[in-house]
Structures are given as C-alpha cells and as structure tokens.
C-alpha cells in the first residue's frame, strides 16, 4: 500500500537522497512463501544486520558467532552500504549463554524489546577502557570522526557496556519494527529524517485536510497571478478604460457615455492573438507552466506521504484527525517514545530520546544557528556612515540552504552524512576552491534569473499588500520579527513552534522598549506633527466634499489625492512618540523582553542603551523594511554570494570540518547541537571550571548553556549527558546558595515576599507578569562590593521551581487536565527566571573584570586556587592548520564586541594575551 516517502515493500530501490545510510530503516516484511535461501555473506562480503545488529567497535561479526540458519520466520539482511534484500532464515536463541556476547533473537511475530525489558540487546559489546566515558549518559553515544583533527570529537561512550557503536566508516542500519496489525501499511522507511520531519509537519499543519487545501490554494494562487497578470497586459484596452477614445457600443439601447468593464475587455480571439505576438511572453508562460507542473508533482508526492503519516497517527499513535488540534506536540512526542519503548517502533537499538527526534528534525537548522553564532551568517554590508547592516532575505536563505545542505552540489546533498572528504584536514584547500566555484556558478544563475524573480516579487507584494495599505495605511509601520531575529535568537534544538511562541510573548515588551528608548528627536517630532496637521486638513476637506456630492469622486485624481494624504498622515504619525510610553522605564521593558527573548542585544557602558536600541531595531524591524529587503533580494543576493560567502569558503569548510560529529544511529550533526558544556561552554556563563573549550570552540552569548537549560526544562524526562548534567546541578546549587543568602540577610528589602503576595492569580503567566514590575537586572554602576541583585532572582527561582515540582500546587481546586496544561507555562516561567539569573551573573562578571580576574572567577565558582598552565587546547591553533594570524572575527568586524578571536581569513591562533582568564582549578 505504501511506497511513498522512500517506503516500498521488497523493491530494491534507493532512498530519497541516495544510498541507504545510518538513517535507513528496514521494516519487517509481510510473511511470504520462503524462496530458496540465498547465501548470506559474512564479514568479507558485507555486514549482516538483523534487528539493528552491529558489531563491537573496530571488530566484525564472524559467522561462528551465529547459529546455523534454520527454517523459520523471515529476517531482513542488509549488505554493503544500503542495498537491502530478504534472507529468509531465522536465528534461534541459544540455550546456554556463551561466554562472549551473542546475539539473541526473538521470533518475527513478537515485538523485540529494548532498554529496560528482559530481552538483552542483540549485539552487546563492552568498549575498551580507553573508550569508556563513565561521566556520560548511556543514552548518548557519539562515535569518533577523524582522529587526527584539531577539534577533539566526542568519543564513543558506552558506560554500561550494553551498546556498541558502528565500525568506523561503516554505516549502521537501524530497524523500524511495526506491530502485526500495521505491517500491511508500513513496509520500508529509508529516510528517518524525512519521517520525523513529516510527523512534526503533519501536526503543525493541522492534519491532512488542511495540508491538502493549503497545497491546492498555493497552486491556484500561482495560476491566478500568472493568468491575471497576462490578462492585464494583453486583454485590456486601456484607451477605452481611461476614456481616451470612445468605445464601440454594440448593445441595443440608448447611447451613454459611461465606460463599462466589458467595453474595455478585448474579445478572446484578439486577446490570444496579442499573446502569441509576443515571443518573450510565450517563453515566460512556458517557464511558468513547467514550474507549476514541478510543484504539482511535488505536492502530489508529499500528499501521498502525508496520507501515510495520517495512517500512522491514527493506528500507531491512536490520534484520529478530529482530535489532532487538541493534542500538543509534547503529547505526540511522548507517544512516539512510548511506542518505541514498548517495542512497536524500534528505530535504533538504544531507547529513543527527545534529543534524537530533535536532531533529525533540526539537523540543518542547528548548523545554521551555529553559523550565525560564529558570525558567518547573516551576510553583512558596511555602511558609509559607520557600522554595518545585516541582510538575510528569503532568497538568500534559500541559496545558502542549496549551497550547504540540499543542493545537488552542496556539502550534505540532502542526506544525513557529511562526505568523508570534508572530515579530512588535508583536503580543505581543494574543497574550499570547489565550493567557491559552486558559489560563483550559483551567483551567476541568480543574476541571470534576477529579472524574473524581481518581477514575481513585485507582483506578489502588489497583490498581497496594496489592499492592506489602502484599508490600513499604518500596517507598513508595524514591526515584526525579522529573519535575522529568528536565526540569532533561536536555541539549539528548538522547534519552530517553540520559537514562534517565545517570540510572540516577547513582541509587546520589545516593541514598547523601542518606542520608549528611541533616541530623542524633537525636530523630527515637530515636523511630523505639522505634517499630520496639514495632510489631515486637506483630507478632511476632500472627504466633506465627497459626502456632500459623490460626483466629486469623478474629478480626475481626487481619489488618488485622498489616498496619498491618508498614507502621509499615517506615516508621519508613526514618528510622534506615544504619550502612554513616556513614563515607562526602558530597563523594565528590556528585562521583560529578555525573559522571553533569552538573548540580550546589549553592551555594558554609557552608550549601551543606544546600542541596545539599534540592535533591537534590527531584530524587530518595520514591515516596510522587510518588504523592501524582499524586493531588493533578487538584485542583492548575487552580490552577497560573490562578496560575502565566496571569500569565506575556507572558513565555512573548516567550520563543518571542526564542528561535525557522528552520532551512532543519527548520523552527522552539528557538535553544538549536543549542548555539551565541556566542549562548547563559555566560562563567563557559569561554566568556568567545567569547560575545556578554547576561544574558537566556545559558543558566544551563552548559547550552549541557555540551550541546554531550555531543553532540560522543556523535557523533564530527558537525561542529559554527564558534563551537561553536572552544569545543571552546579547551576541549581548556585541558585540554592544565593536564595539562602538572600533569605538570611534581613538588610535587603522584602522584594520576594512582595512579588508573591501581590500576585492574586495562581496562574504562572500572572505570576510572571507581576514579577516583571520589580527591577531585577543589575545596575550599570555595579561595584565589587555592591550587594548581588541575582540573589533576589535566585529566591524567586527557587520558589517557582518548588511550585513546578509539586503539580498539586498549580491552580488549586482545578481539574487534573488544567493542572497538566499549566505545567508548560510553569516551565516557561522558570526558564524566564533562569535566563534573567544567568544574564545577571554574566553582567556582574563582565563589569567586575576591570578589578581583576580573581573577582571575575569568584562570581562563577565559590572558591579558587592559584592559576595553572593553560591547557593544550589553548596553545594549539584554533581551527587553522596553516599557522596564519588573522585580523579579527566576522562578529568583531561588524561591531559586536562580545565575540572575539575567530576566523576571517584563516583561524585565530590563541596567544598569551587571549587565553582564558579563569583557568584556576576548583573543588566543589
């Protein structure tokens, strides 16, 4: 039944993106009459994979470790790198456990068990002592990628000895087992990334019916734009429409001078003749028809896949289409995990976790977030008056996606594995040159297609926004989150709906901050008031005349003048400060926005407010600016490809070389997506003493720490790895310590009881809204002896954490469903307080740096000891193999002072003056 999404019974076919890789998922086929059993090749002819059977690290399974094949249920045998064929044999369970790890098989009719079930793993292997990492969680296994590279990959970690990693250079074939009742519909899934992505997209797009209608309407909208534009160009007699010449009235009746629409429309034969007389128009129509057919085929294929996803939701997850809108994504994810734990869905030999699902859905998105964190995205253009302007239009983002991930000549080529050539440091120059030629080719293609794309952009904007502009002229003056904001403010492993919800909560305080913190411009305000007065007076006069006699509208350009005057008055009114925002403190508004944005575009110092305003204005920009960027995108995209991305080809290749890790069962992912504080933590974000990251390996702006904290709060059942778990424990211990210090000191004001007592509503959002009335951010004139304002936040954080851990205290008297529905709101409120608390500690440490490194280290850990020599990671070159000394990082070139020591033309070599300030050892 199902042969879509790369699924297809016993047919030998390649996956959607090519050969089967670590994401391929063979399903147990339907029982068939057993043909003559083919010879199942041993170690020399391909790895035998049964129920995701994988050999021990750096070893191969020998035929002697298996029992002789006997007649029984069919089993799936995978050979080579992905070609699959059926081998009808069975491996019985040994009667006596051997001394070595032996694979245990169950009959095909029974669902295999994993994790905590009684059935042992099929191919357990204990790693060598050099590969064991007792501090890491057994749920996260990361394999070595390139042993000779500068950036240390996360090694194979298998502390319990119950799992094994695939052989280096050999793909792992995880198995998807479906219960007996579903085997008629689910045969073979070859692309788990597409499978999980479509499961998420099906939920977010509200089911199959909405997806079908959305695709139909999009195809119909394309046809309408093309046909209606052609009709306006070739089928309308504008001389008759504008009454420049009399029309030929053929209808019977009295002659009248008014022109009707039918008089201006040409006959169909004449219209077709005028269309055929323009070869350019015919060529454009043919191209449009070809593009529409491609979109139609793509939509049909996707609809077949989504129909299968609907069957999976209904039969496997027990979520019918009519209940989909009332089921949150967290519930869908929990049912997926429960299905895998029960044996109904085995996509890998170890238990599936929330992080595995996010890694597959957000494989490429995490790379983009890391590129933005390292200053390679978005593209920036220097301004003549100083500073720079970021540019990331939809067209440029599509080109970047084609260059890096999904294009035919991209790095990933739409798959889950980075080619091995990019993992070798000796080919970086050749790969960078080849990628630079690809960028040049794509830029030339963009330049050739720019007239067509520009015409399409103009038509789409015209049809979409002109009516809105006439009805609501101030709509273009409204602000919205830019594409830059959605990239820079995004956490690692954050799904799109989570980002949208967070930015929606931050919109109102951020917009109010921009209105309040705008630099004073009395002359501009005075001119705007006068312009509003004169434009409004003229508009009022024309409006009164129109009401008195509607024939005034027949006067030439009267309606045009009224529209222009209304737009002018609305635009001028936007430059007048609102009176209700005059008395509000910008610091409180910025703090409220920070609680939901999680990243603060701010620099300490006397000019911090102006810089914060400019950077916030780039994140929350006017709609008119966004439309202008999209209109200019066809012309600017080739220039940015040539002058921004092509000169940075070597840096981008090095980025993927150093920040790609191979996770067993998942494939190649960005190392930042693991949220490993030890590898990518920053000492100024409470990870001092716990991170070994050099300057080039650190994630800027506390992205690793904040992403880890958000993910752990959003998924309470997820077990983080050892170093990340240690950081979370250290953070909570610091919160408890500061909360106890605040409660024990009676000299401080009772802000915590006041906030809690003033909040009359038990709902978390009401508590959080009441909390932001009190200033929590540290003052600008902080001194080393000033009282720590983070202690007040820690006290509040400890209080709300106790509420979150005790669901009975949420909405007392409410039903169980209401209490469960409020738990995500409590997690959001707790995350907001954690963000404020970490930013307070970070600002204190930044402002105390002039008084010495010792004072800065005290804020991040309770004790310190004499400094020790820098680690080898700091002495070796960061990312660079040529030993060159670059000038500065891309983030530093464009005015952002937080990021330092990166890579514009080679990569930064850590010198003595650039070593970490906090390298002292500390025992808790």
UniProtKB/Swiss-Prot annotation:
Keywords: Autophagy, Lipid transport, Membrane, Transmembrane, Transmembrane helix, Transport. The chain crosses the membrane at residues 208-228, 277-297, 527-547, 552-572. Residues 439-459, 625-645 dip into the membrane without crossing it. It is a multi-pass membrane protein. The keyword Membrane applies. Phospholipid scramblase involved in autophagy by mediating autophagosomal membrane expansion. Cycles between the preautophagosomal structure/phagophore assembly site (PAS) and the cytoplasmic vesicle pool and supplies membrane for the growing autophagosome. Lipid scramblase activity plays a key role in preautophagosomal structure/phagophore assembly by distributing the phospholipids that arrive through ATG2 (ATG2A or ATG2B) from the cytoplasmic to the luminal leaflet of the bilayer, thereby driving autophagosomal membrane expansion. Highly expressed in placenta (trophoblast cells) and pituitary gland. Not expressed in vascular endothelial. The lineage of its organism: Eukaryota, Metazoa, Chordata, Craniata, Vertebrata. Homotrimer; forms a homotrimer with a central pore that forms a path between the two membrane leaflets. This is Autophagy-related protein 9B. Forms a homotrimer with a solvated central pore, which is connected laterally to the cytosol through the cavity within each protomer. Acts as a lipid scramblase that uses its central pore to function: the central pore opens laterally to accommodate lipid headgroups, thereby enabling lipid flipping and redistribution of lipids added to the outer leaflet of ATG9B-containing vesicles, thereby enabling growth into autophagosomes. It comes from Homo sapiens. Residues 229-276, 548-551 are lumenal. One of its GO terms (biological process) is piecemeal microautophagy of the nucleus. A motif (Tyrosine-based sorting signal) lies at residues 151-154. It catalyses: a 1,2-diacyl-sn-glycero-3-phosphocholine(in) = a 1,2-diacyl-sn-glycero-3-phosphocholine(out); a 1,2-diacyl-sn-glycero-3-phospho-L-serine(in) = a 1,2-diacyl-sn-glycero-3-phospho-L-serine(out); a 1,2-diacyl-sn-glycero-3-phosphoethanolamine(in) = a 1,2-diacyl-sn-glycero-3-phosphoethanolamine(out). Residues 1-207, 298-438, 460-526, 573-624, 646-924 are cytoplasmic.
């Amino acid at each position: 039944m199902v042969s879509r999404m790369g699924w297809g019974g016993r047919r030998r076919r390649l996956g959607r993106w090519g050969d089967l890789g670590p994401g391929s998922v063979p399903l147990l086929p339907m029982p068939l009459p057993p043909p003559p059993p083919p010879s199942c090749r041993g170690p020399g002819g391909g790895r035998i994979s049964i129920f995701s059977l994988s050999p021990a690290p750096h070893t191969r399974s020998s035929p002697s470790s298996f029992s002789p094949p006997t007649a029984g249920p069919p089993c799936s045998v995978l050979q080579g790198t992905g070609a699959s064929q059926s081998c009808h044999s069975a491996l019985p369970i040994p009667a006596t456990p051997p001394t070595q790890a032996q694979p245990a098989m169950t009959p095909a009719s029974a669902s295999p068990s994993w994790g905590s079930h009684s059935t042992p793993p099929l191919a357990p292997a204990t790693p060598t002592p050099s590969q064991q990492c007792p501090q890491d969680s057994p749920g996260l296994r990361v394999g070595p990628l390139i042993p000779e590279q500068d950036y240390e990959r996360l090694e194979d970690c298998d502390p319990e000895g119950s799992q094994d990693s695939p052989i280096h250079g050999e793909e792992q074939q995880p198995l998807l087992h479906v219960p007996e009742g579903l085997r008629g519909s689910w045969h073979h899934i070859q692309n788990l990334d597409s499978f999980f992505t479509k499961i998420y997209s099906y939920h977010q797009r509200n089911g199959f019916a909405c997806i079908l209608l959305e695709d139909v309407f999009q195809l119909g909208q394309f046809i309408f734009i093309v046909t209606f534009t052609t009709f306006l160009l070739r089928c309308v007699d504008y001389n008759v429409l504008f009454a420049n010449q009399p029309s030929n009235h053929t209808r019977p009746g009295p002659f009248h001078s008014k022109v009707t629409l039918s008089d201006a429309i040409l006959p169909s034969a004449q219209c077709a003749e005028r269309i055929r007389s323009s070869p350019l128009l015919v060529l454009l129509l043919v191209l449009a028809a070809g593009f529409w057919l491609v979109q139609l085929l793509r939509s049909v294929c996707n609809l077949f896949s989504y129909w299968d996803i609907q069957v999976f939701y209904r039969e496997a997850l027990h979520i019918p289409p009519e209940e989909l809108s009332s089921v949150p994504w967290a519930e869908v994810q929990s049912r997926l995990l429960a299905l895998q734990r029960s044996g109904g869905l085995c996509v890998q030999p170890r238990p599936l976790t929330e992080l595995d699902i996010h890694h597959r859905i957000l494989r490429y998105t995490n790379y983009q977030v890391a590129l933005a964190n390292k200053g390679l995205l978005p593209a920036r253009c220097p301004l003549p008056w100083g500073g720079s302007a970021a540019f990331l239009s939809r067209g440029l983002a599509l080109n970047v996606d084609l260059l890096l991930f999904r294009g035919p000549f991209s790095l990933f080529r739409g798959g889950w594995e980075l080619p091995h050539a990019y993992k070798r440091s000796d080919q970086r120059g050749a790969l960078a040159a080849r990628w630079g030629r690809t960028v040049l080719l794509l830029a030339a293609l963009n330049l050739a297609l720019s007239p067509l794309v520009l015409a399409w952009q103009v038509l789409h904007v015209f049809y979409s926004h002109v009516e809105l502009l006439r009805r609501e002229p101030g709509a273009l003056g409204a602000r919205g989150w830019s594409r830059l904001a959605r990239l820079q403010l995004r956490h690692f492993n954050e799904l799109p709906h989570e980002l949208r919800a967070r930015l929606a909560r931050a919109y109102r305080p951020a917009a109010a901050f921009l209105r309040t913190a705008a630099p004073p411009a009395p002359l501009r305000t005075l001119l705007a008031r006068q312009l509003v007065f004169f434009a409004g007076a003229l508009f009022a006069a024309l409006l009164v005349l129109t009401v008195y006699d509607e024939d005034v509208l027949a006067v030439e350009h009267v309606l045009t003048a009224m529209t222009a005057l209304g737009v002018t008055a609305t635009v001028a009114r936007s430059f007048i400060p609102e009176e209700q925002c005059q008395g509000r403190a910008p610091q409180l508004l910025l703090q409220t926005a920070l609680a939901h944005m999680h990243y603060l575009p701010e620099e300490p110092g006397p000019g911090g407010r102006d810089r914060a305003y400019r950077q916030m204005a780039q994140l929350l920009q006017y709609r008119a600016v966004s439309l202008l960027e999209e209109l200019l995108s066809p012309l600017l995209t080739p220039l940015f490809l040539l002058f921004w991305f092509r000169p940075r080809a070597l840096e981008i290749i090095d980025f993927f070389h150093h920040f790609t890790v191979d996770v067993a069962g998942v494939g190649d992912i960005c190392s930042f997506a693991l949220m490993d504080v030890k590898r990518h933590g920053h000492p100024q974000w409470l990870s001092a003493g716990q991170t070994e990251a050099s300057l080039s390996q650190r994630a800027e702006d506390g992205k690793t720490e904040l992403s880890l904290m958000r993910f752990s709060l959003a998924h309470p059942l997820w077990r983080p790895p050892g170093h990340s778990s240690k950081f979370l424990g250290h953070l909570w211990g610091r919160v408890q310590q500061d909360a106890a210090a605040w409660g024990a000191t009676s000299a401080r004001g009772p802000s915590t009881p006041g906030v809690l007592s003033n909040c009359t509503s038990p709902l978390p959002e009401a508590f959080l809204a009441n909390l932001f009335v009190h200033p929590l951010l540290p003052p600008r004139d902080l001194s080393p002896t000033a009282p720590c304002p983070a202690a007040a936040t820690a006290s509040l954080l400890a209080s709300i954490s106790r509420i979150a851990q005790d669901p009975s205290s949420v909405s007392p008297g409410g039903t169980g469903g209401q209490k469960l529905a409020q738990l995500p709101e409590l997690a959001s409120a707790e995350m907001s307080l954690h963000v404020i608390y970490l930013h307070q500690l970070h600002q204190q440490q930044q402002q105390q740096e002039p008084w010495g490194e010792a004072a800065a280290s005290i804020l991040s850990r309770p004790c310190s000891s004499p400094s020790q020599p820098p680690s080898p990671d700091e002495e070796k070159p960061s990312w660079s193999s040529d030993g060159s000394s670059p000038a500065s990082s891309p983030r530093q070139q464009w005015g952002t002072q937080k990021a330092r020591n990166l890579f514009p033309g080679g990569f930064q070599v850590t010198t003595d003056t650039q070593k970490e300030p906090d390298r002292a050892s500390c025992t808790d």
